[in-house]
Amino acid sequence: MKTHKFTVLLLSAPIGSGHRLAAEALKETFEKNKDIKVVHGNVFDFFPAILGKTFLKVYLWILGACPWLYEMMYKWGNRGGGSLWMREFINGALAYLGSGFIKKVNPDVVIATHATPAGIMSIYKRRKQSSLCLCGVVTDYTVHTWWICDGVDTYFIADE
């Protein structure tokens, strides 16, 4: 007899509503099965609260006041190189900060609906739990370089 329900951890980021809404839609679908426990986590909760709030405010300000700056950063990030070093640094720190939450949830599978949670869990998987099943649901219009992470077992991409 199973000692626990199959646990799905949905991880999203509050950057754009699509990432969160995709996770909520998946949660609603999984919850129809009584044998599945579903937890929806926000990776910004891994930050100290003041940092998460500040980052989100700055991000939203850039989108509204300086969209050209966002476009420039997006293109830089999609080139690889130095941006991948930054991705690894950020995701490594967040994997460390979020490890208590992840251990507490003890998921059988993690589904990331944003590139940052995919990267965080890729590092967590490499460091702590290599057998963890990690999936990415690409919620962007294109597959950004930061989405491509070692350790992601499956990517899901909408076609229409």
Where are these regions (language model features)?
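Conserved N-terminal ligand/cofactor-binding loop architecture of enzyme catalytic domains
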Residues: 25-105
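Extreme N-terminal starter segment of soluble prokaryotic enzymes
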Residues: 2-9
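A short, glycine/small-residue-rich beta-strand->loop->alpha-helix junction that serves as a flexible
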Residues: 13-22
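Glycosyltransferases and closely related glycan-assembly transferases
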Residues: 97-110, 119-135
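Short, well-ordered alpha-helical microsegments
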Residues: 19, 48, 118-120, 143-145
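Active-site-proximal region of nucleotide-activated glycan assembly enzymes
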Residues: 127-160
